Amino acid sequence: MTDGYGVVLVAKQFGIDFDAKPILHVKGGGSSAIATVNAWLSMGGEVKALSGRRDLPEELISKCNSELDANLFIDFDDSSDSDGLVLFPSYSSDLYALSNKIDGRWMLIAQHLLAWAVLFSPEEQKNLPSLDLLFRRLVLLETLT
């Protein structure tokens, strides 16, 4: 649950409007890719599945028929050369400095925020910090080590 809706939360953070039926291009077919496609479709977006190391299940590929340009590209295979807005789910000690590359830390933080908001402490949802604040704090903490 948090993988897919974490990507939706990150997309919204980076200005993607789900009222406009945004297009997601996704490469990969593992559980995170499946959750992401399901969440994106449930929010009213459209998806184009690209071949990767693993493909999405056939019943999901049949729902991924967009031929439009992507508002967001997510690469679960870490092999993207897209010039558009790209989310790389994995991360290392290096931060992406390019404006069109979204560091995987955003997805990690979004997943944790959703877990707290939905699973662990829904009664405290309004008191949780913002995605942006947690990202800045994580980066700051990493510089201290």
Residue ranges of each PLM-predicted region?
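Short, solvent-exposed coil/turn linker segments
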Residues: 16-17, 63-66, 130
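Adenosine-phosphate binding glycine-rich loop
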Residues: 5, 87-145
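Rossmann-like adenosine-cofactor binding region
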Residues: 59-108
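Glycine-rich adenosine-cofactor-binding loop
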Residues: 1-4, 11-54
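Generic local-structure boundary detector
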Residues: 18, 22, 37, 58-60, ...
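Hydrophobic, Leu/Ile/Phe/Ala-enriched alpha-helical segments that form helix-helix packing faces
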Residues: 11, 15, 36, 40, ...
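A polyampholytic, Gly/Pro-enriched intrinsically disordered region
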Residues: 21-24, 74-76, 122-126
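Glutamate identity and glutamate-enriched acidic tracts
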Residues: 46, 58-59, 67, 123-124, ...
